[in-house]
């Protein structure tokens, strides 16, 4: 061994890959023997079609150690300049309570959980999201709120389409106030363009002059002014116009709520409730509406129900509205929400309580009033005499001088043509106000000079008719957790109710619940990334620009694409952006008539829902008995729609968990007919390093960074869905109203140019630490793990789809339908019984009803895979006891699952099976038990008796 060979052998650069990937070499050998493969390479050769295997490795820098990655990323972050930003425009500095920072944002018990589709093991975050909904409902005075949307601008676009669905006007025009945040207007315009809505803009006072189905106004306006909307909304309703109001939660602690003015929908951002600006995200957008619009409201809604014992329980309500069920007829294509950020905002409200929030609001307003008084006294004109936290100054020819003077002092202001905007926030101090006064007046004015006059009429800048008199956050939960001890214990109590990756494997097919490593998460709380305003001057954001550029280059190397947009905030939003790029490409080529989108019957529900959002005609392509796209049916559909064919949306490997042999033929057939190929990146975890969309023949894809590239699921968000394209589509990527680039500025899909920018370091860190070898190894091990699980379960459960050589990709589908026919036990019974064994359920009934889809990922080691397989085999044996008549169909551990501590302590046990079988079916559960906190939740009761707020429901539940 040479000196250099020894040095290389002792290097720690490859250590991270070994820690991320679960099975070590010895475990791999055991697994390979079990599946009758001589090596991992032989398995891959039997699994991935040879004609799509990459001829050479990905071009990525060598892997970095954790320490080296953090050092290099810190150097990038340090290039961001953190000035005092008074830009406002929907983004504000705030103080994240440290108790929330440490116990939620930095806690894998909160950030590694999945969306709470399994309510029995999700009661903690369901309760927190219910608190969030109650907070939004109270502050807006509306009857119903959802559990978050992707951002404020997305919420505005969704409000527009809600008004269209729910309204009775025959108009196809929508009014947008000219005092709305410009980034919101951009996203609304994009949505309107593709569904045939005409946008009319003007002052809010002009609304009555127009025949429109809906209107979007802002309160307070983007320039800070406050208008009483009561009469305006009343006149709109007289003309069958629904009115959506964009508002600010902190302002609503002092201002009359939009609901009290008659608003039909209220939207906004919960960012300033304890969530860092993060250069634009992620943040929880909110939406509240009237109860009568509940069936047409987009997004997830948490509701109250009861469990099998009649005890109160929580669940996601009205799921039949969602895209995975209604597909192209869904109210929205939204899948991921912003659960983690919504929870942070809810905890912020709990920690401060109503009095604490009002105190913060009063302080911000008081400092704004002092600033306004000092400026007025110095002869500077304000554009409006009404304000909460934002004032706009008529600075005329001095605008540039004042702006540059502020920049020289390390201060960012909002610049208009001949005006300057100043927005104060929770972090603003008296000394900050005095510094601002000095910049504009040239004098060292003291705030104390103006406080006495302002205190005498504290709310003079708020019109009397707009001052809040109603109470909010009166529920005990907002009034009991104001000490850090109380808060810490409450958050821990909720966390302990939930199942996350801290407990065990989450084998959800198509969801890729892999490791979210601590080193990847560390940078997101650095102030260099968290404290930057998304509209700060470009010379202050060089760190983010470099991060975005490097990550885009990495993703291009991984995918075979030529350009990336990091703007989309979720996979579904990425689909939407990618389809817009395709349609704009066709329009550019004079092919505006091309609007047919071919979608296999096995596709994710977001695919047809996204296609519907750009007014495409969805044509379904069948699948053959092996789960592949039926090429003959595809040829028929292409020929029928050849002249109008826009694209095909495929997933690879397919949602059936196999690498389709004919994928290149599919791409060629579509291209030959003038169409584009959209490859859904949901299953990219089975491609990285082995093949890629560009090499296969795709034109555009979104990547779920919260799947393949390690951004955690957060209990239901955040997610990110950047889109990659081949060069011919690059000019049609999303842009932004604040963009410094000239490309793609025709439309935007998110409020901020880089979407949820502050979580980009997670994916960057993952790729940097894994390197080419580690990433490729991860893909191979994801395939090995899945095939091992499949082979262990195959003697006990039918496996629905396999490739030509009997292998599967990174996930497999087991068929429960024959067992249900023979025993009466359903896939839901199996899923709930797995909870008693200490596991989260696999994906139920997708893409095939009556099945379970299992994806172990590369991060789980052999011991955990065996624990899961042993549980599934034991459950199959339990089903056999039902089949054989030993246990009645209505009294067995599967139909009563999951079991709780209350079951264990029941005075009389009258069931056909023992308590031990119910609660401690394995040695592992006897040694370390995860307890569901409720029995099986009654979904039907929850939807028939819809309650989406915090107050006790004892009076609603009948015996």
From Swiss-Prot:
Keywords: Oxidoreductase, Pyridoxal phosphate. The modification N6-(pyridoxal phosphate)lysine is found at residue 707. Its cofactor is pyridoxal 5'-phosphate. One of its GO terms (molecular function) is pyridoxal phosphate binding. One of its GO terms (biological process) is glycine decarboxylation via glycine cleavage system. One of its GO terms (cellular component) is glycine cleavage complex. Its EC number is 1.4.4.2. It is an enzyme of class 1 (oxidoreductase). Gene3D superfamilies: Aspartate Aminotransferase, domain 1, Type I PLP-dependent aspartate aminotransferase-like (Major domain). The keyword Phosphoprotein does not apply. It catalyses: N(6)-[(R)-lipoyl]-L-lysyl-[glycine-cleavage complex H protein] + glycine + H(+) = N(6)-[(R)-S(8)-aminomethyldihydrolipoyl]-L-lysyl-[glycine-cleavage complex H protein] + CO2. The glycine cleavage system catalyzes the degradation of glycine. The P protein binds the alpha-amino group of glycine through its pyridoxal phosphate cofactor; CO(2) is released and the remaining methylamine moiety is then transferred to the lipoamide cofactor of the H protein. This is Glycine dehydrogenase (decarboxylating). It comes from Photobacterium profundum (strain SS9). The gene is gcvP.
């Amino acid at each position: 061994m040479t000196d250099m060979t020894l040095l290389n052998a002792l290097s720690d650069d490859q250590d991270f890959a070994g820690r991320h990937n679960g099975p070590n070499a010895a475990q791999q050998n055991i697994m390979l023997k079990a599946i009758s493969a001589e090596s991992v390479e032989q398995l891959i050769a039997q699994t991935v079609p040879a004609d799509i295997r990459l001829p050479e490795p990905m071009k990525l820098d060598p892997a970095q150690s954790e320490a080296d990655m953090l050092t290099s990323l810190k150097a990038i972050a340090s290039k961001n300049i953190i000035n005092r930003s008074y830009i406002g425009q929907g983004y504000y500095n705030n103080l994240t309570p440290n108790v929330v920072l440490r116990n939620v944002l930095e806690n894998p018990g909160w950030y590694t959980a999945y969306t709470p589709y399994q309510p029995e093991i999700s009661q903690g975050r369901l309760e927190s999201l219910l608190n969030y909904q109650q907070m939004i409902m109270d502050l807006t005075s509306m009857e119903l709120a959802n559990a978050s949307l992707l951002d404020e601008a997305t919420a505005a676009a969704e409000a527009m389409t809600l008004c269209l669905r729910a309204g009775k006007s025959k108009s196809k025009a929508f009014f947008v106030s000219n005092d709305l945040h410009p980034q919101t207007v951009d996203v609304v315009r994009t949505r309107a363009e593709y569904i045939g809505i005409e946008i009319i803009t003007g002052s809010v006072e002009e609304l009555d002059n127009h025949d429109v189905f809906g209107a979007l106004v802002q309160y307070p306006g983007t320039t800070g002014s406050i208008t009483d909307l009561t009469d305006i909304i009343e006149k709109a309703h007289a003309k069958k116009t629904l009115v959506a109001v964009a508002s600010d939660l902190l302002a609503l602690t002092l201002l009359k709520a939009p609901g009290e003015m008659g608003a039909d929908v209220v939207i906004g951002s919960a960012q300033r409730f304890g969530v860092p600006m993060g250069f634009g995200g992620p943040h929880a957008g909110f939406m509240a509406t009237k109860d009568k619009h509940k069936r047409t409201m987009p997004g997830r809604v948490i509701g109250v129900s009861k469990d099998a014992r009649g005890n109160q329980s929580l669940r996601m309500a009205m799921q039949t509205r969602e895209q995975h069920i209604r597909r192209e007829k869904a109210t929205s294509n939204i899948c991921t929400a912003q659960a983690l950020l919504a929870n942070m905002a809810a905890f912020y409200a709990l920690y401060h309580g109503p009095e604490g929030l009002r105190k913060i609001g009063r302080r911000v307003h008081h400092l704004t009033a002092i600033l306004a008084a000092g400026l007025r006294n110095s002869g500077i004109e304000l554009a409006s005499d009404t304000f909460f936290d934002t004032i706009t100054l008529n600075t005329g020819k001095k605008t540039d001088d004042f702006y540059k003077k502020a920049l020289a002092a390390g201060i960012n202001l909002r610049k208009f043509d001949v005006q300057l905007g100043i927005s104060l926030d929770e972090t603003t101090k008296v000394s900050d106000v005095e510094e601002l006064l000095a910049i504009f007046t040239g004098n060292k004015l003291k705030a104390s000079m103006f406080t006495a006059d302002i205190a005498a009429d504290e709310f003079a800048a708020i019109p009397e008719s707009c001052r809040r008199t109603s109470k909010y956050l009166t529920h005990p939960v907002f009034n009991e957790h104001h000490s850090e001890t109380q808060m810490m214990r409450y958050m821990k109590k909720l966390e302990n109710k939930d199942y996350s990756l801290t407990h065990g494997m989450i084998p959800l097919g198509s969801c890729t619940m892999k490791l979210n490593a601590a080193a990847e998460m560390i940078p997101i709380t650095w102030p260099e990334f968290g404290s930057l305003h998304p509209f700060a001057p470009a010379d202050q954001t060089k760190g983010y620009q470099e991060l975005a550029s490097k990550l885009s280059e990495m993703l291009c190397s991984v995918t075979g694409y030529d350009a990336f947009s990091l703007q989309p905030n979720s996979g579904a939003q990425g689909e939407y952006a990618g389809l817009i790029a395709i349609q704009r490409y066709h329009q550019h080529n004079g092919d505006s008539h091309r609007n047919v989108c071919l979608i296999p019957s096995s596709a994710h529900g977001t695919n047809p829902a996204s296609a519907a959002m750009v007014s495409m005609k969805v044509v379904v392509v069948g699948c053959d008995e092996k789960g592949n796209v039926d090429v003959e049916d595809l040829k028929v559909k292409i020929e029928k729609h050849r002249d109008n064919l826009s694209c095909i949306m495929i997933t690879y490997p397919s949602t059936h968990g196999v690498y389709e042999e004919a994928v290149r033929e599919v791409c060629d057939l579509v291209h030959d007919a003038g169409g584009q190929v959209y490859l859904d990146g949901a299953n990219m975890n089975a491609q990285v390093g082995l093949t890629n969309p560009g090499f296969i023949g795709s034109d555009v894809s979104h990547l779920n960074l919260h799947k393949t590239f390690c951004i955690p699921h957060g209990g239901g968000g955040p997610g990110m869905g950047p889109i990659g394209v081949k060069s011919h589509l690059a000019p049609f990527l999303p842009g932004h109203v604040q963009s410094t680039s000239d490309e793609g500025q025709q439309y935007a899909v998110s409020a901020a140019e880089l979407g949820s920018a502050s979580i980009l370091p997670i994916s960057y860190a993952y790729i940097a630490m894994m390197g080419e070898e580690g990433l490729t190894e991860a893909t191979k091990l994801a395939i090995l793990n899945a095939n091992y699980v499949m082979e262990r379960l195959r003697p006990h459960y039918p496996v629905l789809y396999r490739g030509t050589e009997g292998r599967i990709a990174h996930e497999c589908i087991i068929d429960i339908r024959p067992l249900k026919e023979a025993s009466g036990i359903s896939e839901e019974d199996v899923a709930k019984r797995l909870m008693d064994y200490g596991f989260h359920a696999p994906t139920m009934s997708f893409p095939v009803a009556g099945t379970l889809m299992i994806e172990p990922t590369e991060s789980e080691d052999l011991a955990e895979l065996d624990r899961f397989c042993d549980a599934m085999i034991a459950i199959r044996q339990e089903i056999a006891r039902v089949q054989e008549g030993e246990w009645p169909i209505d009294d067995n551990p599967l139909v009563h699952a999951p079991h709780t501590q209350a079951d264990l302590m029941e005075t009389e046990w009258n069931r056909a099976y023992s308590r031990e079988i119910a609660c401690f079916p394995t040695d592992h559960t006897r040694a370390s038990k995860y307890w569901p906190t409720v029995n099986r939740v009654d979904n039907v009761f929850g939807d028939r008796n819809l309650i989406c707020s915090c107050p006790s429901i004892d009076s609603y539940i009948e015996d």
